C-alpha cells in the first residue's frame, strides 16, 4: 500500500460508494489453432490482439496504470521442463501436475504463512508439492499506482496422486483453491487482501494484472520465451466504467473473460447460495462441502459468473452446455427453433435463471475455446478462419494483420449463438451442431411432458372468494388507497390495457420526508441501464422478452434427472383470485400449499410489527419442514384487531430469511395482498423474490367500479379484468427492459432497486444486499404509518367521511400531498 493508492484491491464501502456495484466494459479476443498445434506464434498473436484492443481499455490519472489486462494460455510444459534445474525439481509428464499462478502478500511473514496454509491443504488433499517458483517480473515497467498495490507473484507446482486422471486432478485443484481462499481470508493477516489465485490447473495458466496491454510482455518476461507455447490464447483488456481497478479483477478468469454487465447479479448470487444446501455430485463426493460458498463475495459480476461456470463445468457438463444454461438464447417465442432444442432450454430454465445482461463471453477449458453472445446481441464479436487453420475472434475486426486471400471464412457472432473450436477433435463446430448435440443428451421433451404442468392443468376450485362490496371502502383505506389511485391508475389501466402515462418530473417530497402516511413501495427506486449498459425496447424486441416463471422445489443443479423439471409453469406472474385458489388447493406430485398470514396485532403497537415478521419467518421455516412447497403470504383478514404487514416487507423478509437458512429453493412464495395495484408495486414484489402476486383488492376495486357504472356501458367485466392484467404485464416488461433485463425469471429476486430514506439496519435485515446510500426511517416508522392507515380505516362512520384520501401525488389537490409549486 501507499499514499498514492491506499487500497490493496477494491476499496471498502464508504459514503455513497459500495463495491457491490462493480461492473466493467472491455475488449475480449482469442486466437487458436484448429489443429491444436502448439507454438510460440499463437502466444505472440494473442499478445498482439491484446495490444490492438488497448483502446478498449482505460487508465486513470496515472497513464502507466491500466484498468487490467491479461492472457490465458495452455500450460507451457516444454518451458517448465527446461526451467526445472533452476527450480530445483523436475516436472512430471503433461496432465500429471498442476501449476498455480498465485498472488501473495508482499510482507515476508504474511507470505510464508499463506504458503504454509496452501502446502498444508495440498497434502491434506492427497497431492504432492513439487515446489514454488518466483515468477520473473519487471515491476519497473508498470505505473506507480499499479506498483503500489502489486502483490508478490509466485507459481506453485503440484503433482497428482498415483492413478489420478487429468479431470480428477482438475477437480482436486479446484477444491484446494477454494479451501485456500476460505482459510487464508479467515485469518487476521494484515496483508491477506493481497492473496488471490488467478489460476490453478493442469491445463491452463493465466498471466494478468493491473496493466496496460503493451505492458504484458514487459512485466511477465517469460511470455517472450520461444519455449512458451500454446495452441490457444485468450486475452482481455479491461475498461472499468464505474469501478475501481485491481489486480484481482483483471481478466481472464479461470474459464471466461467477459465484455458486458450481469444486470441480475444480486439475484443470481442469492439463488446460487440457496442451491448450495442440495448440491450433490458423484464426481466430487464429500468434497462438495469444501467448495462452499460457490460464489465468492467481493468479486466483480464477471468473477461471479466464472465461479458458476467453474462449478458446472467441473461437475461434468461441457463448456458449451454450461454457457447455454447460464446465458440462454431467446427461445420462448422463437417459432423457427426446433422443438428438441426448445425443450433443452425449457428443461434448464427449471434449474437455473439466466444471468441476464449485455454480454460477450469468451471461454476455454484448455481444450475447447469459443465465445457466446447474450440473447439481445448487445456486445460485438467478430471472427475469421484462415486457410491454414488459424481462428481469430475479438470484439472488433482487424485485430491481426491477415491478408484477405488467406481468409477462408469470416463473420460475426449473432445474438444467443455460440462459436466453438475443439482443438482435440481438430475442428470448428457450428452453433447448429452444438445445439443439436446438447438437445440429444437427454429426452428433455419427454421429461417435460411427464413432469411439467401449467395452471390450466389443475382442477377448477369449488370456491373462489367473492367481492365484499360492504367492506371494500374500509379495506381500501387500510391499504392506503387514494381517490387518485382509482381514477388515475386503475381506471385508465383497465380501460386502455396499458400503464397510464404521465409527464416527467416529480415535485412531491420523498416518502421519508412526506407528512402523509406512505406505502413502503414509495421508499424504493429502480436502478436503470447506464454507461455501457443499454436498455431494451420491450415492444420492438418482444421476441427476447419473457414473463415465464417456474414454480416448484428446485433440484440439484449438478445432475440431470426428470424430477428437476417437476414444475408448474406460470405464463403470467400476476394471477386472478380463481387461479390463486387453484394453487391453494393444488394436489399434484410434490406440490402442497399453505397460507401464512401477513398481519400484525394493532394493540401491540410499533414493536408488534417486527415481532409478527419474525413469527412469519419462523412459520415459513416450519412449513418447509412439514413438506409444503407453495407458501401463500396473505393479508386477507384485516379487521379492527389486525392491520396488514406491508407486503413488500413481509415478502423480502421471508425471502432473505430462507436464503440465509438455505431453504429458499425448496418453496415458491406467492403474495396474496390488497396492497399492490400499480406496475412498480408488482415489480418490487417480484424483484424481491415473489413467484406470483394476487392483487385481490385491486381486482375487487375494479369490479366495484364496474358495478357502479364507472366504465362505458358496453364494457364487460371480463374485458375490464383482462385489460388490467394486460396493462400490468406490459408495464412489467417495460420495467425489466429499462434495466436491460429480458426475462421475468432473471428479474425475480434480482433486487434491482435502491432505497431512499430507510435506515441501514432495516435494509440489511429485511432487504439484504439492497443499496441504501441515503438512510432514514426504521421499522418503527413503517409500523406507525401502517397503524395510521388502519386507524383511519376503522374510524366510526360519524367521525369520518366514507371517501378515500385524495392522494395528490400526480396532480395537486388541496388536501393532498405537498408539491414544490403548490
Name every feature range the model reports, one short phrase each.
Residues 2, 60-231, 235-237, 241, ...:
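Extended, highly charged
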Residues 2-39, 183-198, 203, 208, ...:
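Glycine-rich phosphate/ribose-binding loops and adjacent secondary-structure elements
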Residues 71-77, 139-140, 144, 456, ...:
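Short, conserved secondary-structure transition motifs
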Residues 58-60, 206, 224, 368, ...:
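Anionic-ligand anchoring segments at beta-strand to alpha-helix junctions in alpha/beta enzyme folds, i.e.
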Residues 66, 79, 295, 312-359, ...:
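Flexible, glycine-rich loop/tail regions that form catalytic "lids" or insertion modules at the edges
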Residues 2-9, 29, 128, 144, ...:
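Long, low-complexity, charge-dense
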Residues 6-106, 110-116, 479-536:
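N-terminal amphipathic, basic-rich helices that act as targeting or association modules
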Residues 45-49, 249-298, 373-418, 428-456:
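Extended active-site and interfacial segments that coordinate phosphate-rich ligands
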Amino acid at each position: 500500500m501507499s499514499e498514492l493508492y491506499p487500497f490493496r484491491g477494491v476499496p471498502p464501502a464508504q459514503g455513497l460508494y459500495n463495491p457491490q456495484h462493480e461492473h466493467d466494459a472491455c475488449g475480449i479476443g482469442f486466437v487458436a489453432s484448429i489443429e491444436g498445434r502448439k507454438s510460440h506464434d499463437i502466444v505472440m498473436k494473442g499478445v498482439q490482439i491484446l495490444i490492438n484492443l488497448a483502446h478498449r481499455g482505460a487508465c486513470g490519472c496515472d497513464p502507466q496504470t491500466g484498468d487490467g489486462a491479461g492472457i490465458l494460455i495452455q500450460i507451457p510444459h516444454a518451458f517448465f521442463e527446461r526451467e526445472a534445474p533452476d527450480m530445483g525439481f523436475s516436472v512430471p509428464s503433461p496432465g500429471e501436475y498442476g501449476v498455480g499462478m498465485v498472488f501473495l502478500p508482499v510482507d515476508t511473514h504474511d507470505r510464508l504463512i499463506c504458503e504454509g496454509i496452501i502446502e498444508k491443504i495440498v497434502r491434506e488433499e492427497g497431492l504432492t508439492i513439487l515446489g514454488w517458483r518466483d515468477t520473473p517480473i519487471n515491476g519497473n515497467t508498470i505505473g506507480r499506482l499499479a506498483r503500489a498495490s502489486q502483490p508478490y507473484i509466485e507459481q506453485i507446482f503440484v503433482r497428482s496422486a498415483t492413478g489420478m486422471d487429468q479431470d480428477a486432478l482438475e477437480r482436486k485443484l479446484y477444491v484446494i483453491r477454494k479451501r485456500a481462499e476460505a482459510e487464508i481470508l479467515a485469518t487476521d493477516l494484515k496483508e491477506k487482501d493481497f492473496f488471490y489465485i488467478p489460476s490453478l490447473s493442469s491445463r491452463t495458466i493465466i498471466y494478468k494484472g493491473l496493466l496496460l496491454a503493451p505492458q504484458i510482455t514487459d512485466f511477465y518476461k517469460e511470455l517472450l520465451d520461444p519455449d512458451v507455447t500454446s495452441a490457444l490464447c485468450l486475452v482481455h483488456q479491461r475498461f472499468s466504467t464505474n469501478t475501481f481497478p485491481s489486480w484481482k479483477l483483471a481478466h481472464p478468469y479461470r474459464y471466461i473473460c467477459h465484455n458486458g454487465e450481469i444486470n441480475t447479479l444480486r439475484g443470481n448470487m442469492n439463488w446460487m447460495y440457496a442451491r448450495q444446501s442440495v448440491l450433490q455430485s458423484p464426481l466430487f463426493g464429500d468434497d462438495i462441502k469444501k467448495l462452499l460458498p460457490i460464489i465468492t463475495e467481493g468479486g466483480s459480476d464477471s468473477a461471479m459468473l466464472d465461479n458458476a461456470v467453474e462449478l458446472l463445468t467441473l461437475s461434468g457438463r461441457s463448456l458449451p452446455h454450461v454457457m447455454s444454461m447460464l446465458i440462454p438464447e431467446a427461445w420462448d417465442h422463437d417459432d423457427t427453433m426446433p422443438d428438441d432444442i426448445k425443450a433443452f432450454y425449457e428443461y434448464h430454465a427449471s434449474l437455473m435463471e439466466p444471468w441476464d445482461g449485455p454480454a460477450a463471453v469468451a471461454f476455454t477449458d484448455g481444450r475447447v475455446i469459443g465465445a457466446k453472445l447474450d440473447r439481445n446481441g448487445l456486445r460485438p464479436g467478430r471472427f475469421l478462419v484462415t486457410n491454414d487453420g488459424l481462428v481469430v475472434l475479438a470484439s472488433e475486426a482487424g485485430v491481426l494483420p491477415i491478408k484477405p486471400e488467406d481468409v477462408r471464412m469470416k463473420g460475426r457472432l449473432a445474438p444467443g449463438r455460440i462459436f466453438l473450436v475443439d482443438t482435440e477433435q481438430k475442428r470448428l463446430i457450428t452453433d447448429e451442431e452444438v445445439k443439436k448435440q446438447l438437445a440429444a443428451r437427454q429426452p428433455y421433451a419427454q421429461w417435460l411432458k411427464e413432469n411439467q404442468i401449467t395452471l390450466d392443468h389443475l382442477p377448477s376450485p369449488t370456491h373462489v372468494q367473492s367481492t365484499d362490496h360492504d367492506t371494500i371502502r374500509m379495506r381500501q383505506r387500510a391499504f392506503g388507497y387514494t381517490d387518485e389511485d382509482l381514477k388515475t391508475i386503475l381506471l385508465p389501466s383497465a380501460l386502455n390495457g396499458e400503464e397510464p402515462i404521465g409527464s416527467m418530473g416529480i415535485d412531491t417530497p420523498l416518502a421519508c420526508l412526506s407528512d402523509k402516511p406512505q406505502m413502503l413501495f414509495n421508499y424504493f427506486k429502480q436502478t436503470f441501464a447506464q454507461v455501457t449498459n443499454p436498455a431494451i425496447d420491450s415492444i420492438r424486441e418482444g421476441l427476447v422478452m419473457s414473463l415465464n416463471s417456474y414454480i416448484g422445489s428446485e433440484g440439484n443443479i449438478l445432475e440431470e434427472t426428470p424430477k428437476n423439471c417437476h414444475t408448474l409453469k406460470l405464463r403470467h406472474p400476476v394471477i386472478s383470485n380463481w387461479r390463486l385458489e387453484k394453487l391453494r388447493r393444488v394436489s399434484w406430485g410434490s406440490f402442497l400449499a399453505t397460507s401464512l398470514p401477513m398481519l400484525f396485532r394493532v394493540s401491540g403497537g410499533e414493536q408488534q410489527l417486527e415481532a409478527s415478521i419474525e413469527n412469519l419467518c419462523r412459520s415459513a421455516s416450519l412449513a418447509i419442514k412439514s413438506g409444503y412447497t407453495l407458501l401463500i403470504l396473505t393479508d386477507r383478514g384485516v379487521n379492527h384487531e389486525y392491520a396488514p404487514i406491508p407486503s413488500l416487507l413481509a415478502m423480502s423478509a421471508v425471502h432473505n430469511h430462507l436464503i440465509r437458512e438455505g431453504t429458499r429453493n425448496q418453496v415458491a412464495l406467492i403474495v396474496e395482498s390488497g396492497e399492490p395495484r400499480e406496475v412498480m408495486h408488482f415489480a418490487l414484489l417480484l424483484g424481491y423474490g415473489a413467484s406470483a402476486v394476487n392483487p385481490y383488492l385491486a381486482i375487487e376495486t375494479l369490479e366495484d367500479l364496474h358495478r357502479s357504472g364507472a366504465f362505458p356501458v358496453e364494457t364487460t367485466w371480463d374485458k375490464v379484468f383482462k385489460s388490467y392484467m394486460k396493462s400490468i404485464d406490459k408495464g412489467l416488461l417495460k420495467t425489466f427492459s429499462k434495466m436491460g433485463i429480458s426475462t421475468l425469471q432473471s428479474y425475480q429476486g434480482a433486487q434491482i432497486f435502491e432505497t431512499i430514506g430507510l435506515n441501514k439496519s432495516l435494509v440489511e435485515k429485511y432487504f439484504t444486499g439492497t443499496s441504501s446510500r441515503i438512510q432514514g426511517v426504521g421499522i418503527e416508522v413503517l409500523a406507525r404509518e401502517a397503524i395510521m392507515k388502519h386507524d383511519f380505516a376503522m374510524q366510526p362512520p360519524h367521525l369520518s367521511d366514507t371517501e378515500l384520501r385524495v392522494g395528490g401525488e400526480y396532480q395537486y389537490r388541496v388536501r393532498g400531498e405537498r408539491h414544490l409549486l403548490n
